[in-house]
Amino acid sequence: MSVQHNFDLTAFNTLALKSQCSDYVALTDHNDIEPAIRYAKAHGLNVFVLSGGSNLLLPEKFQALTIHMLMQGKEILSENDDEVVIKVQAGEIWHDFVCECCAKGYHGLENLALIPGRVGAAPVQNIGAYGVEAGEFIETVWAYDLKQEQHIQLTAEQCHFGYRDSIFKQQAGRYIIYALSFKLLKHAQLRLNYADVAQRVGEDATAEKLLQTIISIRQQKLPQPEQFPNAGSFFKNPVITAQQFSDLAEHYPNAPHYQQHNGMQKVAAGWLIDQAGWKGRRLGDVGMFERQALVLVNYGQASLQDVQRTYEQIQTDIYQKFAIRLEPEPVLLNQFGEISPHISAY
């Protein structure tokens, strides 16, 4: 285990925010987690776990031990004629894992193709797209519990998965995820909930065709971080009450929405942002992408403060126009490497 000091993280966050941590270590073996924790304690440092850097807002400098989870490997734990359970290490690239599973006839994750990041980050936000969430297929999560100071296994039920939510987000900073298992299907049950996806896939739908369709849609709508640094979808789709939606629909009858199990309505945040005039609009080096209003882009040398100023203005404008609160998705880090709550713009 080799610790590096004053390590530049600019290339390790997809928004390309200039950032430097006091201490950094890249781990390829989960057995090195405990030595890394001992190092942090001995030096009075908090621990910040870095995965793919795709859902992060980093400060220019922070005092913490950044543990970069780069473990690799996959193995089949069990299988039968209908299902397969695959254990995958946290450092594997998410999109590569999804594509490999589909190619081998292990299905369920196709709608989540091309989401940036590594596998270990999938349970934290319970990543989701086009009607599918990772938590639906996660069976077990292996992690180190910093509170109990021991390795643990959590079932999907214990993970408390919700919309862009989990126990790992609720108790941020407590768990270091190093592996997880997915229960996937050998007979594809395609999710074609979204009209755009269903139309493109067509009647002769297959898992491979669905996978390629999702990839094509995301490539057309979303900027690649290498060209336009971004953190993916920046705001959660707000879930509002039936009365709130009724008020919205009275003025905007074509507002995109999705019925929830509890009678609530999920409204498309990108549509709200577009209607408020923010699609393609910029404040200095920060703006919302011209082809997808939900994606915030660093067009130059933006700082964390520039990003915060922009998204807080968007929150204010949306609330004033629709009386709906938008919540940012990315994790915000403070100067001590701790996950910090976003300051409300309302």
Question: What are these regions, as identified by a protein language model?
Answer:
Residues S2-V141, D145-K147:
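Anion-binding (especially nucleotide phosphate/pyrophosphate-binding) glycine-rich loop
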Residues Y106, L304-V307:
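Beta-rich strand-turn-strand
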